[in-house]
Amino acid sequence: MTVTGRFAPSPTGAMHLGNARTALLAWLHSRALGGRHLLRFEDLDTGRVRGWAYDLTRRDLEWLGLDWDEEFRQSERLDLYAAALAGLDTYPCTCTRKEVLAAIADSAGAPHGEEAVYPGTCRPGSVHPERPAARRWRVPEAESCVTDALSGDTLCQWLPRDVGDFVLQRNDGVYAYHLAVVVDDALMGVTDVLRGADLWTASPRQAALHRALGFTPPRFLHVPLLSNYRGERLAKRGGAPPLSEWREHGEAPGRVLADLAHTLPWPGFQAVPEEVTAPELLPLWGDVLAERPGT
């Protein structure tokens, strides 16, 4: 089987060092296994997209020595998401977030996990006729389990209790992240999804959506997020310095790659020299994979 991986940034601003580290690891994974590597711009939320961010992202990746075999934009694939949505058991929902949280607070149970679980208010068809409607997936009465191929951890979620009916199309017509990423990974032939650990808890619902659409879920590998000196994850919204600052100030890309490698938790990366190329890191990632039978 040919491995296909991907890096899927949102062009809502400039890449920061945390994005660069995830991009590096995704590239190392694809190339260490002799596979294809895709660049996919997740640009469905057009209100937040910045037109200049596409080219800036490409320049930053090329500066680091990271290449890709094919490029995609989600904004050019809307018909595929519409077709997938039509094949799923969904229903209209006119609940606001405030109403959802109020319904949960009034119920006997508390929210499960890190986010509020939709209580099913609109499931019987009781929608507000004067509001635009989102589309929610009526999740099956089933458990969805995912084993992380990197850590070996397994996460199981009972979909109705732990996830709830979740939005696949917003009330403004924008297709939701979970639908688009599942359709894209399946139709692009992505076999291995390496991404940040913040998306670990989303993996069971995405695996369930893969199966509901007749696809085989990919292997998931979740890597630690890069934090600042306060222990907070780097984020565009949090004002993390853009990677382009290092490039524009004449910093050598090899030094940036070495600095990123030194932050990784696996043996060997902390010992790389002060300057290194991306291909020179491939054997180290190969060593990481060799210790994990799931990869």
Swiss-Prot record:
Pfam families: tRNA-synt_1c (PF00749). L-glutamate binds at R6, F7, A8, P9, S10, E42, Y177, R195. Its EC number is 6.1.1.-. SUPFAM superfamilies: Nucleotidylyl transferase (SSF52374). GO terms for biological process: glutamyl-tRNA aminoacylation; tRNA modification. Binds 1 zinc ion per subunit. Zn(2+) binds at C93, C95, Y118, C122. Coiled coil: none annotated. GO terms for cellular component: cytosol. GO terms for molecular function: ATP binding; glutamate-tRNA ligase activity; zinc ion binding. Keywords: Aminoacyl-tRNA synthetase, ATP-binding, Ligase, Metal-binding, Nucleotide-binding, Zinc. Its cofactor is Zn(2+). Belongs to the class-I aminoacyl-tRNA synthetase family. GluQ subfamily. PANTHER family: GLUTAMATE--TRNA LIGASE, GLUTAMYL-Q TRNA(ASP) SYNTHETASE. This is Glutamyl-Q tRNA(Asp) synthetase.
